[in-house]
Amino acid sequence: GKVTMGAGDVGEILATAAGVHTLDQWAGAWRAMAERLEGVARRAEVGGHCHSAGEAYLRAHEYRRQSYFFARDDLDAPDLLEAWEAQRDDFRHALRLLEVNHRMIAIPYEDTELHGYAFIPAGAGPHPVLVALSGYHAPAEEMYTVAGVPFALARGHAVVVFDGVAGVEPQTET
């Protein structure tokens, strides 16, 4: 699913996995691949290749997310928060460069807000709306591929994704 929607490349995934022999190596391997792709994306954007840059940022977003996937002991750990913010930033760069029609949203919940995105298909509405929320380890950004947002938009469906109440702590940031 994620590779089909552009959030991964089989060659990059296999190359990254080949360097992982222990759980301790996991975060560093995925972080390195994400950083490599962020560089590719920056150079592509500077060169005027915005779509290619957006594709690289989308993959970097997923690889950043992979880098902290197993980090559950300390949700306030600086490395986790840094990786979370980087995956969010990469995702937002991808949306902008790929020209994905969206709005950032905040849904009131108890004494906080659940942040997410509303994706709107081309054409006049009304549009059927799909609502997808993330779970404990899935930020709203990951739901872009998990919920099949590109496929839904292509079929005229609007999609709302948002962090769940048990999501990673930075869910309350925009």
What residue ranges belong to the model's regions?
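N-terminal cap/lid segment of alpha/beta-hydrolase-fold proteins
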Residues: 30, 34, 80-125
